[in-house]
Every structure is written in structure tokens, then in C-alpha cells.
A protein has these predicted regions:
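Structural microenvironment flanking redox-active thiols in thiol-disulfide oxidoreductases
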Residues: 1-24, 29-33
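Solvent-exposed coil/turn segments that connect beta secondary-structure elements
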Residues: 7, 30-31, 62, 149, ...
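Residue-level signal for well-ordered alpha-helical positions
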Residues: 15, 37-40
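Structural micro-motif
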Residues: 20-24, 39-57
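A short acidic, often aromatic-flanked loop/helix-cap motif at beta-alpha or helix-coil junctions
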Residues: 31-35, 164-165
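Short hydrophobic alpha-helix segments
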Residues: 37, 68-69, 135, 228
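Thiol-/selenol-based redox modules, centered on thioredoxin-like
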Residues: 48-104
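Extracellular/lumen-exposed scaffold segments
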Residues: 81-241
């Protein structure tokens, strides 16, 4: 990981030292590299003149760009962890029902106002069990719902591709998950004055609540729908200014 900015090396070093940043911060005098990649924000003036459009490039081990992600504004930015789909070491929860085991994790341990990070639900159906995917409209599909609150903006959840399953008792072909799968839901920390003030407090925390609703079936029986409450916790830090 590395970041590039038009700031001089001394400014970048002071910023990195103050924030505990260990990855390289690259100085781009005169925004030469930014201009070469056609990333210069030509509408930026005054103190912001020379800045690039906010974005992230993903490279493979050979240094080849494999994907990129750009933002509409500088204030709300996806975290590196959410872009690469990483899971932090701190597991925030584990739940088991009669049909599934669930683990809840996050892309980041620490977030700031404006950060767009991801919460994950890893779902493992038990032996012979399956749940219906969102594209199976004739039954109750698996659904993740994040509880809205004033500190976050909730984005749409993302589900992996499902598999086709033949339910022999009814001779029906259905779209299901019968193997472990992950649901990803991004949330953006609000930039409101209240949340910024809250982030300045020592040991400030942000709690995201939600629920997973599903109906599971085995090869013979469909069980009652279940709603499982879920919680994710991350530490909240103030913006660097």
C-alpha cells in the first residue's frame, strides 16, 4: 500500500508520524505524476489546487493495475480494508442456530467520520441445509438488514452468486446457498457535527446493529423462518486536521 500527494516530504513525514502511518506516503512535486495519469482535479483552486480526484488503484504482485475505485468527494472515502474485502483479526461475534453458524467481522478496527467501511456476515449452512438466495422470489430469501441510525449511512448489501438446487420432494429447481458464503454490507460514518464531536472522545466506539433473516430447508423439510440479531463494533477516531 502507498499514497501519493503533492505535499512535500517533510509535511508527509510529520503527518505520518502524528498518525502512526507505516506505509509509504509519496511526494509528487508539482503534481507531475498526478497529471501524467490524468488524475488532476482541474476544478480545484486555491489551497486545493494540484490535488487529484480521490481514488484508489489496486495492483497485483507484478505491479499491474487490476481495478480502481474513485469517489465523488474527498470527505467520504472507502477504507482500504473495504476495497480489498479484508477481515480484521478482531472477530466481533459468532452465533449458531439450528441450521447455520454465523460469524460477524469488519473490514476495519478503527474508522473516522466520512469513512466507508464494510461489515461482513460469514454464513455456513449445516449438513444438508440450504437457504434461499435473494434471486429466489417464490420463497423467503436470506436478507441482511442494517438498523439505520444518525451515525451511519447504510448501503445495499452484496451477496455472492447462488447455486441451482433441485428440491426433489416438489421437483423444483431453486436458487440457494448450501455452502459457506459471505454477505458484505458497506456503511459510511456520518460527517455531522455530532458524530465529529463524538469521535473526539477518548475510547469512542461505533456500534452497527442489524439482523439476518432466513428460511432454511434440508432435503426433506423446510423450517420456520428465523431472524438473528447481529452487532458489529469499531473504534471511532477523529479526523486528521
Amino acid at each position: 500500500m502507498a499514497a501519493i500527494s503533492y505535499d512535500p516530504p517533510a509535511t508527509l513525514k510529520a503527518f505520518a508520524d502524528a498518525r502512526g502511518i507505516t506505509f509509504p506516503l509519496l511526494s509528487d512535486p508539482g503534481s507531475a505524476t498526478i497529471k501524467a495519469y490524468r488524475l488532476l482535479n482541474e476544478q480545484a483552486t486555491g489551497k486545493t489546487a494540484g490535488i487529484p480526484h480521490p481514488g484508489t488503484f489496486m495492483l497485483d504482485a507484478r505491479g499491474v493495475v487490476t481495478s480502481r475505485a474513485f469517489e465523488a468527494s474527498y470527505q467520504e472515502r472507502a477504507t482500504a480494508g473495504s476495497l480489498i474485502g479484508s477481515t480484521v483479526k478482531g472477530e466481533t461475534g459468532s452465533t449458531e442456530t439450528g441450521q447455520l453458524t454465523l460469524k460477524t467481522t469488519t473490514s476495519d478496527l478503527v474508522v473516522a467520520p466520512g469513512a466507508r467501511f464494510a461489515v461482513f456476515v460469514d454464513v455456513a449452512p449445516k449438513s444438508r441445509m440450504h437457504v434461499y438466495s435473494p434471486d429466489q422470489t417464490t420463497y423467503i430469501p436470506v436478507a441482511l438488514e442494517i438498523t439505520p441510525n444518525e451515525a451511519i449511512k447504510v448501503h445495499a448489501p452484496r451477496f455472492p452468486p447462488s447455486e441451482e438446487y433441485l428440491f426433489k420432494p416438489l421437483n423444483e429447481r431453486q436458487r440457494v446457498y448450501s455452502r459457506p458464503f459471505r454477505i458484505v454490507n458497506e456503511v459510511t460514518v456520518a460527517l455531522t457535527p455530532a458524530v465529529r464531536e463524538r469521535a473526539r472522545a477518548a475510547d469512542a466506539m461505533l456500534t452497527v446493529n442489524g439482523s439476518l433473516r432466513y428460511q432454511a430447508c434440508d432435503d426433506k423439510v423446510c423450517y420456520q423462518p428465523v431472524t438473528v440479531p447481529l452487532t458489529w463494533n469499531v473504534r471511532l477516531e477523529p479526523l486528521a486536521r
